[in-house]
Regions:
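Short internal beta-strands
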Residues: 14-24, 125-127
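Short, surface-exposed amphipathic charged segments that create phosphate/polyanion-binding patches used
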Residues: 58-71, 138-142, 239-245
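Short, charged/polar "capping" segments at the starts of alpha-helices
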Residues: 24-32, 132-134
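Active-site-proximal specificity loops/subdomain of glycosyltransferases
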Residues: 35-89
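A glycosyltransferase accessory/donor-loop signature
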Residues: 158-160, 165, 169-171, 175-336
Length: 336
């Protein structure tokens, strides 16, 4: 993200304070993230908050609310997503923030988004293109969700969303993976309480818990932001995002995660960035572990993969990787 962001605006220097909400992240990985950030320390800072080790009000409530999820939601999502409902309490020092998911790749400058006037909106977000998943009406979305519920073993009951509510979601298909959040207005309007109250009435009936909540509770007060701030890779090349240079953030929501298969859209670009971090040995090990999937690649993607790998297999990296494997073996032996 920081390699793509502007460092000043109208002659004023910008500073990016990044807050990572984590769940039992190891001290080793925290240090790796800090090392990855160090080249950008002149205009950025990073802090970590472990929600499982924090007894403050917002995080204890998050743990309680997570217990109300249906089995499907508990398996698909972490309790981290519920932190979005309590952003005003988690970050009392700010009036406005940008929040984004971690399954993302920044390919452009997002700083301009922060200065977007809110005009009485609780938050700004982009809309998904539902036509990409063959949904062209509220009825299509309703049927899709019914089938999804049955497939996931979620029973329909009085807490399930009504056709009218699904219609609201269809008309307002906002994706919560990137949000410009007006925390000052949240506090003024007691929005957190409204979100929690609505959640308690529907809890186990929600398939996309916090995203559905935001749309249904905040409808009419959501600012539609340019889709460039939250682009699914499949959107590139469509009328919404004609080319990659039109995007600021690629968001790998749904199942096509770039670390799962090198043939997925923009997997190569994601790996190029990942190899520049302090996690390069883990990234390489993951690629090796997925080697069986490469037989599924077409000839173009196979060539692309081996050309990419060839640029990474230098002497220095291979020595680092061997030392990494030795350390992991010793660590495993010592912990027996």
């Amino acid at each position: 993200m920081l390699s793509s962001c502007a460092q000043e605006r109208d002659g004023v220097k910008l500073f990016y304070q990044i807050h990572c909400l984590v769940d039992s992240l190891s001290a080793e990985n925290i240090e790796k993230l800090k090392r990855t950030m160090s080249p950008f320390s002149a205009f950025s800072g990073i802090e970590f908050c472990d929600i499982s080790k924090n007894d403050a009000y917002p995080f204890t409530l998050v743990s309680q609310l997570f217990l109300r999820f249906n089995p499907f939601a508990k398996k698909r999502f972490s309790k981290m997503i519920l932190c979005r409902l309590l952003l005003a309490s988690i970050f009392p020092q700010y009036e406005k923030i940008i929040m984004f998911d971690v399954d993302t790749l920044f390919v452009g400058d997002i700083s301009e988004g922060f200065f977007t006037p809110m005009d009485g909106a609780y938050f700004g977000a982009t809309k998904e293109d539902l036509s990409l998943i063959n949904i062209h009406s509220a009825n299509d979305l309703f049927v899709s969700r019914l089938n999804w519920s049955r497939g996931m073993g979620v029973k329909l009951n009085h807490k399930s969303l009504t056709f009218q509510e699904v219609g609201i979601l269809y008309e307002n298909p906002f994706n919560a993976g990137f949000m410009l959040v007006n925390l000052a207005l949240w506090r003024e309007s007691h929005l957190e309480e409204k979100l929690i109250d609505f959640f308690k009435t529907r809890d186990e009936g929600l398939l996309l818990p916090e995203q559905d909540l935001f749309v249904l509770v905040c409808q009419g007060r959501i600012l539609e932001m340019p889709c460039k701030y939250n682009v699914h890779p499949r959107m590139v090349g469509t009328r919404m995002i004609p080319k990659k240079s039109d995007a600021c953030m690629l968001h790998f929501y749904a199942d096509e995660k770039p670390w799962k298969h090198f043939g997925y859209p923009y997997s190569k670009e994601w790996h190029q960035v990942a190899f520049k971090t302090s996690f390069e040995s883990l990234v390489f090990e993951n690629l090796v572990g997925k080697i069986e999937t490469f037989t599924e690649l077409n000839d173009h993607n196979k060539k692309s993969f081996f050309e990419f790998l060839n640029t990474k297999l230098n002497k220095k990296f291979l020595i680092q990787y061997i030392l990494f494997k030795i350390f992991k073996k010793l660590e495993s032996f010592c912990l027996r």
